[in-house]
Amino acid sequence: MVILSHHKRSPPLLMRLFRICRFFRRLMSSSTSSVESVEDESCSNECSASFTFDTNNNSRGNNQVNELAEETHMKLSITPTRESFSLSQLERIITIGKGTFGRVELARDKITGAHYALKVLNIRRVVDMRQTQHVHNEKRVLLQLKHPFIVKMYASEKDSNHLYMIMEFVPGGEMFSYLRASRSFSNSMARFYASEIVCALEYIHSLGIVYRDLKPENLMLSKEGHIKMADFGFAKELRDRTYTICGTPDYLAPESLARTGHNKGVDWWALGILIYEMMVGKPPFRGKTTSEIYDAIIEHKLKFPRSFNLAAKDLVKKLLEVDRTQRIGCMKNGTQDVKDHKWFEKVNWDDTLHLRVEPPIVPTLYHPGDTGNFDDYEEDTTGGPLCSQRDRDLFAEW
């Protein structure tokens, strides 16, 4: 049994017009060219366009798949960044994200003025959706991870009905929004983002953690335009393989569908899907229904447009190798094989890791708490269903 959640965005027309005006005003004042003008050049020579897109149309439905069976909890060492956070010192401003059993709000520290993303989860809904273990896993994993391309988590709180995760506010919004607005990215743009993702995956895998939910919706842009991987609800520490199906249908690896067990290879498969989607504007395996998407993945009918860069095509084919033992990134040299691929030959990996490469997109921001790059949501005035003491006990150590 699986859960399919559908997420559609549709902000008011005035907000869309406002964002379009911001886009053209900022673009006209920039001396750099637009995103479509970026050609196959070295990452260090990327043109930088500063803008805000309309982030709301043509969503692919965001089908999220997660098997109901709970997974075995794997303990991780936890070193909280800050233990002095409390909800009382945060002013909750506006909702910037919404999910099946929770939402994300922009919050401001009343003392320092700093802005944070506050993830609010309704305990009853988490339990009803049988996501208890995934929520615990996300907290434990995020508190362990410290990397420039991964969103930071600072602390957690709870009250009688909700769980809270105090996280880094990433003001650029989702990569998904920019990709849908521009329809596709140039070869060099896709390579820039892929190189930062490779660094993040290398780090995660070195800790024995599999991400399992790589997709444009989970990739945020920092104020400078660098990648920030978010939403680690499906992340898991693995010693061998796991058998739970989780992720987005378009991005599921064949071994996940076959239930033969999967490991970090699913992240490399997802990277292949992501590179293809960035350059084409849609994932390679498509269908009108989830079943049709699964059939396309299993049949592995991989087609490329004629304009697809040959080196990128070669890498995508190797990332989308059905035999996971032969998939690039999964063999003896691991991530190094990916980094040594000819598509990345112009990438200076040290410069990439240390944020010395200029991003091709710099989000438009007018002040530190600017939420113009996010969708608009109705505020929750009810707080959601009340939970029982039995539900609360599941999060006694939160």
From Swiss-Prot:
Record carries keyword Lipoprotein: no
Residue span(s) of domain AGC-kinase C-terminal: 345-398
Coiled coil: none
Record: active site: 213 (proton acceptor)
Domain of life: Eukaryota
One GO term describing the cellular component: cytoplasm
Keyword Nucleotide-binding annotated: yes
UniProt-listed Enzyme Commission number(s): 2.7.11.11
Keyword vocabulary terms for this entry: ATP-binding, cAMP, Kinase, Nucleotide-binding, Serine/threonine-protein kinase, Transferase
Pfam families linked to this entry: Pkinase
InterPro entries tied to this protein: AGC-kinase_C (IPR000961), Kinase-like_dom_sf (IPR011009), Prot_kinase_dom (IPR000719), Protein_kinase_ATP_BS (IPR017441), Ser/Thr_kinase_AS (IPR008271)
Binding-site list for ATP: 96-104, 119
Gene Ontology BP annotations: cell adhesion; signal transduction
Single annotated GO MF: cAMP-dependent protein kinase activity
Catalytic activity: L-seryl-[protein] + ATP = O-phospho-L-seryl-[protein] + ADP + H(+); L-threonyl-[protein] + ATP = O-phospho-L-threonyl-[protein] + ADP + H(+)
Ranges for domain Protein kinase: 90-344
Family the entry assigns: Belongs to the protein kinase superfamily. Ser/Thr protein kinase family. cAMP subfamily.
Name by which UniProt lists this protein: cAMP-dependent protein kinase, catalytic subunit-like
Source species of the chain: Caenorhabditis elegans
